[in-house]
Amino acid sequence: KGHRRIAALTADPDDSSISQLRYSGYARALRELGIPPEEEDVICADDFTVESGCRAMRERLKRPADFTAVFAIADDMAIGAMRALRESGRSIPEDCSIIAIDGINVSEYIHPMLTTLCQPMTAMGTKSVELLLGVIRGGAHDHLTLPTTLRAGESVRDLTK
């Protein structure tokens, strides 16, 4: 929604395929929009937890921060980052927007409600079991992409208005 300086809150992309995939999708989307990903705006957390997201954002905010939005690779990390942003005197979404991936239920109950890309958790579980059983029976490992939905919360400010 008009943001040009977007920080990425990720777990170490060298340690996790989930981090690698989500970060590479984020970076590709930025490049497609003509926005070069800035290395200084990559915030690496230790893991995918609320605590780790909070710690990583606190550490990043010790340096000047001119990003207007944060993309977190997990809802839990975003929730932690929101706390650190508020502690630093920033208001969400007025001073900094935040969006994440997962669609966990608690993201609907925090304030402001987190904007998140929801994964089809039940379908993921079902398809995982089906794929595993197929492999056990000697079948090929299929690549599967499941649809996601955007749950628009209250954590993103529209800068185009």
Pin down the residues of each PLM region.
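Bacterial carbohydrate/catabolite-sensing allosteric modules
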Residues: K1-K161
